[in-house]
Each structure stands twice: as C-alpha cells, then as structure tokens.
Amino acid sequence: YAQYGLDEPVCTIHITAGEESYTVTLGDFSKMDEQRYISIGDGKVYLVSHDPLDEFDAVLRDMILDDTIPEFDTAKQIAFTGSENYTISYDEETKSICADDVYFTDGKPLDTAVITEWLTSLHELDLTNYVSYNVTDEELETFGLDEPALAITLDYSSSDEDGNETDSGTLVLHLSQNPEELAAYEEAIANEEDVLPDVTCYARVGDSQIVYQITQSEFDALTDVSYDALRHQKIFTADFDTVTSIDVTLEGEDYIFTYNPPEDEDDADVEGTWTYQDTEFDIFDFSYALRVLSATSFTDEAPTGQEEISLTLHLDNEDFPTFTLTLYRLDGESCIACVDGESVAFVSRDKAVDLIEAVRAVTLGA
C-alpha cells in the first residue's frame, strides 16, 4: 500500500449503513493521469476519476446543526430574568382603553406594536456564528453566560385557520456580553474617552452546547425590554373616533367641544362634525396634537408648576368612559403629564404648546 500512499492516507472515511460499516482510505494521485488511489477495505486498490476528497472539503461550521428560533403565531407568555425581572402575558380578554392591547404585565398594558417588533427581532436572530460547539463551564464564564445579562423564557403556540392549536412549546434564550470587554467599556465611559472599545455579545439557546456570537445591535434590540421601553409612549392611546365630547380648561376658562354623528350612522362614507358654541370646526389639528403627544421619559413626580391645560375626553367606551389629561409646566423644555390625576410622564413643552394652540384656534375662531 505504501507505493499508493495508502499506508499513510490523506483521508480516512468511516461509513456506517445499518449494521454494516465500511472504511475508505484515500492515497496519492497516480503520476500518469492524476487520478486518486483509494481502498475500500477489500484488499484491493482502485483508481477513481472523481476525487472523493472534493466532497469532504466542509469545515466544522458547515456541518453543525445550528439551534433555531421556532416559528409561532402567539407569544403566550414572556418572562425576563437578569437585567429585567418581570413577566408579560398575552390576554385578549383584559380591558384596556386601547383596543389593540393584548400584552399586559401586572394588569398594565404594553404597546402591541413594540412587542411585535421585539418578537420580530427575536425571530430574526442570526444563530450561525458559533464560538463554541461543545461549551465548557470555563467557557461559559468567559462568555458571561454563567450569569447572563438577560434570560428570556417564551411560551408560544401556533394555531390553524379554525383556531385549533397545532403546536406549542417553550423557548429559553440566554444573552450575555464578554465580562472583561464590558468592564473595559464601562471604564472608558467613566473616563469620558472618545473611542470606546467593542464588546462581544453572545447567545445560547436553553442548555445547548453551542454558543453563538451575535451583533451589538441584536443584543441591544433583545435586551431593551424594560417596562418603560415596552409600554405605550403616546399619552392618549384610545381611538380618537370613540371621542364624543371634550371638556377643556385653559387659562381659567372652560370650553366644550361636541361631536355630532351623521344622521345615517351606518353610512361609512358620511362623517360626523365637531362643533363649539354651535359653530362647526375641523377637529384634525387638535386630534393630531393630542395623538402625537408622547413621553420623553416616565415619572411619578408630583407636579408643582402651573397648570397649562386640562382635557376630559368623553369616550364611547363602557369600560373607559372618560380620559382626563392635565399638563403642568415643569420648565422651558418639559411639562408633566397627569392622566386621571396620576403623574405619568414628562412631555415636550413644544408639543404641549401645539395642543394649546389647537384649542385656541377653535375657541378664538368661533
């Protein structure tokens, strides 16, 4: 076999088929036609025109069976532990002023659009760039996965067109950052350095032996899950079409705006009108200013400044018949927004002024 290079083969291939096993060894090329010498264990040497080694140029990365994020229709429950510690539940029965709300934590609604975007980021997580395919305890510590920054436990389900559940399960995902690199990054922040070092981020599915490197943007998107990040940023979340009248208090004066439905309420092409002191006006500027009023950050700080404006919106909603919003001046940049008497958020004073000006345009134009 030595003359064919089969005493020290360049490749040995072990094949098992049922109860049979075979060993194929690849030797040198023939000098005449550059064909490969092979042995299949039957004591003979063969020349093959197609080199079997061409089919075995895959590296380990090509052969790993990567973990995957399952496809599902509904996230029934999402639990966070680590940097955040709370649970989100999917509930179509709980009442909320926003008809689209189906995700809640401790009875408080979250923004369905934001949760959906987060779930999309989870679905699209790229689990291909492995850093360990048989992770050890020492490696877990090196990757920061012995104490993950965030652990996500998601109970999911899928249903057919008739609403019958076809699949369900639980996904556990651990996310971390390299501890040494993170410490260097935080030190650079503290020292106000101009150039900040990179921090490697990792993901691990459940107790899988495979650990993946993920991008910083993927890590940031999946770990930005504080209650304030996932709750509604807009102050008024009801459908404005459910508003039937508005009581306004501005600079000590009271005003009432009234919605007048069309005579034929079943005709979708006919719109109702808004009036103030029996004068019809266009509600768009007011409704837009109200709908874009959003939190710059959230607070429970009691207001001490001057009241800028107060609105009580009457809604065609048995569970939430009224919504009262009062804005108090904080400084030249911000106001404190109180909803039904409770401080909720800081809002831009510019946006508050837009709302005030929309009211003045109606009252002064009547």
Regions found by a protein language model. Give the residues of each.
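Secondary-structure "cap/kink" motif recognition
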Residues: 1-366
